[in-house]
């Protein structure tokens, strides 16, 4: 029987600090749940104790990625918060030009493909959607575009027939011929690579900011502002609290709330 690797209070706090520095995510409120889940994760890291794990985490690039994958696992599904997705597409269509959209984080691709699906239904062809995430496993799943089960539950049968290819094992694979250009990249919003992604008309950052501390939120707003085109829009999740900054103004419209680049 393998010995459990249990972190001390100080070690757990150090782990939370490292994750915050790497990603902006604040896990302080999830400390108790984290302590319970960490042991199983540590079994696959080939470390003798938590102190050794922390040492490796600071220098081992692969372990950093595996750890980020571990702490950023979340549930998502097609057409989540549908009213807001429709508003994004309504605004995109009103621009009457090629529209670039960034989905950050994109998780396993459901949000990106949902936007592309809605764009196709609204006869929008000249659109580019880039999905980014710091979790390498979900990025690979998004690129594959293969889904089954609960994540598809909000799609109609006609949508499945048009936008997916069904296999005998009940998996549904995205039919990319029916959609606009959708791409996915492994990217941390706080790293230099983010600044080189290009310019966007719309950023959908839903249900990520809720996990950031105040300082990280402010930093993120500045970075979003930098890659948005003039009058570009930021759409966030219902639970995301956005600090007041010089970069965006909050707009209340009949179709919902969004943040416009100042």
From Swiss-Prot:
The keyword Methyltransferase applies. Residues 1-262 form the CheR-type methyltransferase domain. Its EC number is 2.1.1.80. It is an enzyme of class 2 (transferase). GO terms for biological process: chemotaxis; methylation. Pfam families: CheR. GO terms for molecular function: protein-glutamate O-methyltransferase activity. InterPro entries: Bact_Chemotaxis_MeTrfase, CheR_C, CheR_MeTrfase, CheR_N_sf, SAM-dependent_MTases_sf. S-adenosyl-L-methionine binds at residues 76, 80, 111, 133, 188-189, 206-207. Keywords: Chemotaxis, Methyltransferase, S-adenosyl-L-methionine, Transferase. Coiled coil: none annotated. It catalyses: L-glutamyl-[protein] + S-adenosyl-L-methionine = [protein]-L-glutamate 5-O-methyl ester + S-adenosyl-L-homocysteine. Methylation of the membrane-bound methyl-accepting chemotaxis proteins (MCP) to form gamma-glutamyl methyl ester residues in MCP. This is Chemotaxis protein methyltransferase. It comes from Campylobacter jejuni subsp. jejuni serotype O:23/36 (strain 81-176).
């Amino acid at each position: 029987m393998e010995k459990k690797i249990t972190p001390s209070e100080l070690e757990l706090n150090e782990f939370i600090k490292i994750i915050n520095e790497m990603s902006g995510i604040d896990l302080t409120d999830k400390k108790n749940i984290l302590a319970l889940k960490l042991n199983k994760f540590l079994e696959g890291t080939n470390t003798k104790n938590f102190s050794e794990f922390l040492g490796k985490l600071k220098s081992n690039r692969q372990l950093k990625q595996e750890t980020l994958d571990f702490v950023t696992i979340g549930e998502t599904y097609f057409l989540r918060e549908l009213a807001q997705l429709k508003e994004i597409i309504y605004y995109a269509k009103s621009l009457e030009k090629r529209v670039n959209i960034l989905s950050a984080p994109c998780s396993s691709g459901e949000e990106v493909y949902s936007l592309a699906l809605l764009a196709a239904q609204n006869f929008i062809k000249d659109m580019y959607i880039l999905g980014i995430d710091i979790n390498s496993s979900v990025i690979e799943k998004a690129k594959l575009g293969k889904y089954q089960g609960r994540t598809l539950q909000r799609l109609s049968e006609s949508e499945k027939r048009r936008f997916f290819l069904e296999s005998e094992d009940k998996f549904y694979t995205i039919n990319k011929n029916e959609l606009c250009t959708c791409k996915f990249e492994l990217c941390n919003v706080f790293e230099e690579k983010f600044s080189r992604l290009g310019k966007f008309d719309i950023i959908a950052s839903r249900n990520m900011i809720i996990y950031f501390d105040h300082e990280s939120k402010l930093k993120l707003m500045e970075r979003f502002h930098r890659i948005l085109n003039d009058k570009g829009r930021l759409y966030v999740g219902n639970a995301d609290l956005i600090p007041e900054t010089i970069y965006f103004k909050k707009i209340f419209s009949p179709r919902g709330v969004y943040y416009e680049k100042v």
